[in-house]
Amino acid sequence: VARPKTISDQRVLDAAHRVIGRVGPGFTLAQVAEEAQVSVGTVATRFGSKDRLVRAVFDNATAEVAVTMRTVAEAHADPVAALRAAAVGTFLSLGDASTAANHLGQLGHDLIDPVLRGKLATHFEVIRAELARAFDRAAGQLPGAPRAEVAVRVLLSLVNGVSIDWSVRPHGTLADRLGEDVDAVLGAWAARDEGGKG
């Protein structure tokens, strides 16, 4: 009879996320095991290899960002505030500047690996879909915005670019930086174009 699984996969995945934030792509399974307070054998048995663990961490992050963006958006009755919250909520899991830089280092590794690059594309598509969902609700209050497809692409490019720039040159918090830049775009879109739409 198989022994019950008392250590959840989520516990190991959360530990791996924290270790990557502290160490970057050079992390080891032993460091993850220590962080999760389990044996290296447990980590290896669950995930097989470091590469497979990273893929599982990526899948977990993709699922979590969708939940986070939708949850923070639904906390606002005002559609524009909800869109802002969704955009600002995209990369809050990066943490502070030092952990964000290490996650950025992991991103460089991800781009080399074709499987991880595919997972990154899926991650961005999930973010795009949540931004599109929020934008659809807010579009009526953003008369200066381009068509939905372009608007969502602009927001996705904005949050991706800000997160990378802030990771390299951190000033203040990431949430504040994202909020300021998202506000600049949404504020412009909220203003009616007197020469065109009006």
Model-predicted segments: where are they?
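Helix-turn-helix
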Residues: 7, 11, 15-52, 56
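Solvent-exposed, amphipathic alpha-helical segments
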Residues: 15-22, 68-75, 102, 106, ...
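Residues in soluble alpha-helical coiled-coils and helical-bundle/repeat scaffolds
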Residues: 24, 48-52, 56, 74-77, ...
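Hydrophobic alpha-helical connector segments
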Residues: 56, 70-100, 145-155
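Short, basic, alpha-helical segments at the C-terminal edge of helix-turn-helix-like DNA-binding modules
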Residues: 59-66
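Amphipathic alpha-helical segments used for helix-helix packing
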Residues: 81-82, 94-118
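Short, solvent-exposed amphipathic helices
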Residues: 102, 115, 119-133
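Hydrophobic/aromatic-rich alpha-helical bundle segments in the mid-to-C-terminal region
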Residues: 117-121, 138-198
